[in-house]
Amino acid sequence: MAKVKITLVKSLIGRKKDQIATVNALGLKKIGNIVEHEETPQISGMIKKVSYLLKVEEA
């Protein structure tokens, strides 16, 4: 499985609770935080749900 590098680029202020929970589940808390995950169907679904808040790159 490929690894993806995920960066939070937009604020969570004013977002719906489920979107905030999704970003937190990815391990992101503040703007500029970067995490690496294996690209599983679960992670891909979370990325698609809040894609407008994130920058995603191949690691």
Swiss-Prot record:
Q: Which Gene Ontology BP terms does the record give?
A: translation
Q: What are the protein's GO molecular function terms?
A: structural constituent of ribosome
**Gene Ontology cellular component annotations, sorted alphabetically:** cytosolic large ribosomal subunit
Signal peptide positions on this chain: none
Q: Iron among the record's keywords?
A: no
Key words, A-Z: Ribonucleoprotein, Ribosomal protein
Q: InterPro entries per the record?
A: Ribo_uL30_ferredoxin-like_sf, Ribosomal_uL30_bac-type, Ribosomal_uL30_ferredoxin-like
UniProt xrefs under Pfam families: Ribosomal_L30
Q: Does the keyword Ribosomal protein apply?
A: yes
Q: Report the sequence similarity comment from the record.
A: Belongs to the universal ribosomal protein uL30 family.
Subunit relationships: Part of the 50S ribosomal subunit.
Name of this chain's protein: Large ribosomal subunit protein uL30
Q: Which organism is it from?
A: Clostridium botulinum (strain Hall / ATCC 3502 / NCTC 13319 / Type A)
The gene name on file is: rpmD
